[in-house]
Amino acid sequence: MYTFKVETDLKAFDSFLEENGGQYIQCSAWQNVKTTWKCTYYCGFEGEKRVLAVLVMERSLPVAGKIWYASGGAVCDYSNTELLREFTDFMKEEMKKGGATCFIMDPSVSLRINGEDQASGHEMHKTLTDLGYELNPSIENYTYKQPVQLFIPLFEGDTQLTADKILKKCDKGVRYSIRIGEQRGLVAESYTYEDVEKNPQIMDDFMAVMRDTSERDSFVERNGDYCTKLLREFMGHSDLKLVYYDKDIDEKLQAERLQKKEKALAEMKTAHEKKARQLKETIDSVDKQTEHYEKRMAEAEEFTKDRRICVAGGLSIYYAGMGSCLFGGTRNVIRNNTRSSHYLNYLRLCESVKRGCKIHDLGYVIVKTPELQEDGTLGELIPQDNFKGIYDFKKSFSADYHEFIGEYILVGNSLKYYSYAKLMPTAKKAKIKAIKMLRR
């Protein structure tokens, strides 16, 4: 027998999340980010022991009424069917008292990992549907999260992996792309909320990165105020990394390469055959790098006369053992020449390792709505065409592709809920269209 109540001790609520694999979207700081939602905190107890915690956000909509949503679901032992049953009964009563149209949650329970079925995911689908939840089969209508994420494990057993050891699992091309960043004039800075407050140009640079990225990959980026709010509310658990192309540094590196070539040319005059071949390789390598350098400088000069250009950036949150890459991208300048996206993501991975995280979360990709399987679960979740490249990039870092069980709805008022379900796609499209028109 379990008891449930509205939780007012948010410190205890957050402590439970941190100790039991909760996510930043489930903690009390999230209400200060999602200010258009009304937040209520619930906890479940077995005697005096806290065994469940859930942040329920409420939004009132015309026609649809009150929509309740728990991002990431409840933090609890999902294999405990009795706990889930009693929690569901409790939520049904709360919905009646609050006049809620529905309660939506999307538990981070994997249905497939790298394409392999997970029995626990199929069992969870059956448990939830037996308890009265309905699976939302239309991915494009999901409330907030896509039902996929790409994770890089940072531990093997009790041993933390180094960033270099993780990279050994990646393709050779990934390791090469990371290495050449610093060799071609890239430098990075890590900023906090305080830094952004003192120097607004930092956020302006990041927004320029995100605008280029969103236009290139056909999505709508968050604005600077929202990103600043995330840094503020997760102060001490967040950072903003910006990667710059520094022309002065690149010029210095090129001068060093040319000196190396001159030395090789001088030694060639007296070198024996084997040594001469090695020197020839050095000279050819410098010539090739010089060609890249000249293209880089020409492209950068055409883009701006500034000596330092922000070419990439990423905002991350580190919470409860997970380093989450929320937003990130690159400018449309010297992207391929410097491999700035690889360099940025390597730095973000290093930060997660440095902070002792167990998982590095590369985030989600937008997926297509699948056919349902025979047991009623979601079929294979395939990235939309404009996100295929992003998916391939994230997978190249040896990330595991988790397909979650999806979004489940407990319906309180059928008429209002199905009106909401019918109107939501139209409302989402109208919102995106309006944002794009305003930005043009």
Residue ranges and their predicted role:
Residues 266-285, 414-440:
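Membrane-proximal basic amphipathic "stem/tether" segments
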Residues 165-170, 218-222, 400, 429-440:
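Short, basic, helix/turn surface patches
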Residues 108, 187, 365-367, 408-412:
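Short linear capping/connector segments at secondary-structure termini
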Residues 64-145, 309-312, 318-397:
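Acyl-donor binding region in acyl/amide transferases
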Residues 134-143, 401-413:
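Conserved catalytic-core motifs of GNAT/GCN5-like acyltransferases
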Residues 5-64, 109-115, 132-143, 149, ...:
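A conserved beta-strand-loop-helix scaffold within acyl/acetyltransferase catalytic domains
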